[in-house]
UniProtKB/Swiss-Prot annotation:
The gene is MT-CYB. Component of the ubiquinol-cytochrome c reductase complex (complex III or cytochrome b-c1 complex) that is part of the mitochondrial respiratory chain. The b-c1 complex mediates electron transfer from ubiquinol to cytochrome c. Contributes to the generation of a proton gradient across the mitochondrial membrane that is then used for ATP synthesis. The chain crosses the membrane at residues 33-53, 77-98, 113-133, 178-198, 226-246, 288-308, 320-340, 347-367. InterPro entries: Cyt_b/b6_C (IPR005798), Cyt_b/b6_C_sf (IPR036150), Cyt_b/b6_N (IPR005797), Cytb/b6-like_sf (IPR027387), Cytochrome_b (IPR030689), Cytochrome_b_C_euk/bac (IPR048260), Cytochrome_b_N_euk/bac (IPR048259), Di-haem_cyt_TM (IPR016174). It comes from Dicotyles tajacu. Its cofactor is heme b. This is Cytochrome b.
Amino acid sequence: MTNIRKSHPLMKIINNTFIDLPTPSNISSWWNFGSLLGICLLLQILTGLFLAMHYTPDTTTAFSSVTHICRDVNYGWIIRYLHANGASMFFICLFIHVGRGLYYGSYLFLETWNIGVILLLTVMATAFMGYVLPWGQMSFWAATVITNLLSAIPYIGTDLVEWIWGGFSVDKATLTRFFAFHFILPFIITALVIVHLLFLHETGSNNPTGIPSNMDKIPFHPYYTIKDILGATLMILILLLLVLFSPDLLGDPDNYTPANPLNTPSHIKPEWYFLFAYAILRSIPNKLGGVLALALSILILALVPALHTSKQRSMMFRPLSQLLFWMLVADFLTLTWIGSQPVEHPFIIIGQLASILYFLIILVLMPVANIIENNLLKW
């Protein structure tokens, strides 16, 4: 008799995805982040659901309802901070996951990579709308500033912004629709994740060498289930340390002041995970140019497969590309820091140089380094 997990229509899918999946025997801990992202998504949906039970998407009561969750709801404070800091963990895992893909050439799985880029954009949109919901000063002004960027689009810009706002400024209509979208998008993300996995399992996983490993596969369970449990335990430990010891470490103090359209905060900035893109936006003195650079800072990932000129897939045996990759990581961290600083000397020039370097490394230096490395192979 066939085992039920191999014959039952539903169990068969789960079995082929998480149990009997043939997996390369040499994938390192950098491959843990996919499962960690899945755990983050589940955590965000669960905590978000419980928050939505007590939250009211109305400009007059939104701020008070968040305070009520923290003060009066049983364990409301921990649910709220798990949700807020869970988003930070989500983005840390996302950035590492994308970085892993860039380093080991996983972007050559085109369908998987492109769905991944769409996922990144969707998660960013969801996080942005979630940041608006507590209706604090930074929520309100971040919503005003970021949505206003669309007014840079020629001809239709102003109409588009007013259409998104549902009026002539960020108000009740904006908050209500942002709550609706913030609620529905995680389920769309879940659907995209399934498609992402579907495409990945068509080709099988990449591995650190970038060499096909079809002759050396092992079952996902028990080898990688136990490895993923270790990764998940460490991530949850870090998240709990953050939530229980310094829940506001990554937040903005301005968001503890109720939104006031008549009083602009001295320094408007988004959450830390958007600061790199925000720094690129601010480094260009022209509004439309800044918006284009902002969009390109993420969409450039979709171009990476087309810029791959190397004969080798992974960077494991390519020292020049490795150097450029770690320069890109350092540049990303520099941009994140610059985004949190006020617009004054020397931060302006540092931001401009870091922005130029960001695009230069990806569009020019990496492909050139690949060609040089190809020629070095002939020696």
